[in-house]
Swiss-Prot record:
This protein's encoding gene: MT-ND4L
Function of the protein: Core subunit of the mitochondrial membrane respiratory chain NADH dehydrogenase (Complex I) which catalyzes electron transfer from NADH through the respiratory chain, using ubiquinone as an electron acceptor. Part of the enzyme membrane arm which is embedded in the lipid bilayer and involved in proton translocation.
Assembly and oligomerization: Core subunit of respiratory chain NADH dehydrogenase (Complex I) which is composed of 45 different subunits.
GO cellular component term, pick one: respiratory chain complex I
Gene Ontology MF, one: NADH dehydrogenase (ubiquinone) activity
Name of the protein in its database record: NADH-ubiquinone oxidoreductase chain 4L
EC numbers, comma separated: 7.1.1.2
């Protein structure tokens, strides 16, 4: 395993650990999710370029589209929760209330 792959994998693991440890605030959870998506994007791009997968060139672009949709929905949820409750605590999210 080269140093590039090791650093990208370490970035993914650090983002995952941050997501598991700092679950109380929605903003920190969203930032950790974005870090995970960024490291997945870089890992996928480096793998495709190193192995010359010509048929998989669109996969990183599709991953970025899903990451942008996830970020937009996460920010929408953050704004709605902070306007309703005044804080961005995850404990304020109760899916049973309509």
């Amino acid at each position: 395993m080269s140093m590039v792959y090791a650093n990208i994998f370490l970035a993914f693991i650090m983002s995952l650990m941050g997501l598991l440890m700092y679950r109380s605030h929605l903003m920190s959870s969203l930032l950790c999710l974005e870090g995970m998506m960024l490291s997945l994007f870089v890992m996928m791009t480096v793998t495709i370029l190193n192995n010359h997968f010509t048929l998989a060139n669109m996969a990183p672009i599709i991953l970025l589209v899903f990451a942008a949709c996830e970020a937009a929905l996460g920010l929408l949820l953050l704004v709605m929760v902070s306007n309703t409750y005044g804080t961005d605590y995850v404990q304020n999210l109760n899916l049973l209330q309509c």
